[in-house]
Amino acid sequence: MRLPGRHVLYALSAVTMLAACSSNGARGGIASTNMNPTNPPATAETATVSPTPAPQSARTETWINLQVGDCLADLPPADLSRITVTIVDCATAHSAEVYLRAPVAVDAAVVSMANRDCAAGFAPYTGQSVDTSPYSVAYLIDSHQDRTGADLTPSTVICLLQPANGQLLTGSARR
């Protein structure tokens, strides 16, 4: 398959053995205050801001839980004999970066749809066209399909960017 002017290095697809996946949850946050102008508080309230987290160390995660902005030290093999990946801080050398998670139907056109969605999501994340960038595109497909085969959707395509020259990335490609 080809994305406009660029070969897709490879496409990994799979039907996972899990019926659903969970997100990694919230990251950081701000405690809100009551600032209703019609009922001002009796005493001054202040907003508390969580401290900036320290750089994230490497962690192992199942690939179906990858989130936009995750940088991967490694990728699962094409045969999916291993379903975990190592996520690292994007400032360190890494093999790929997740730039899009998008719903996709699992049917005969899944490869075409995944290519279309990954191509469309590239420029908004990187600020570059996939044709003129130093990156190649790959993807993983998590079908979320139940084991009866009765429900083929919703499914998720997880789009990854990698250096076209096969070298490692250092830093995020996010604009």
Curated annotation (Swiss-Prot):
Its main location: membrane. Keywords: Cell membrane, Lipoprotein, Membrane, Palmitate, Signal. GO terms for cellular component: plasma membrane. It is found in: Cell membrane. A lipid is attached at residue 21 (N-palmitoyl cysteine). Residues 33-48 have a biased composition (Low complexity). The keyword Lipoprotein applies. Residues 31-56 are annotated as: Disordered. It is a lipid-anchor. Disulfide bonds: none annotated. A lipid is attached at residue 21 (S-diacylglycerol cysteine). Residues 1-20 form the signal peptide. This is Putative lipoprotein LppN. It comes from Mycobacterium bovis (strain ATCC BAA-935 / AF2122/97). The lineage of its organism: Bacteria, Bacillati, Actinomycetota, Actinomycetes, Mycobacteriales.
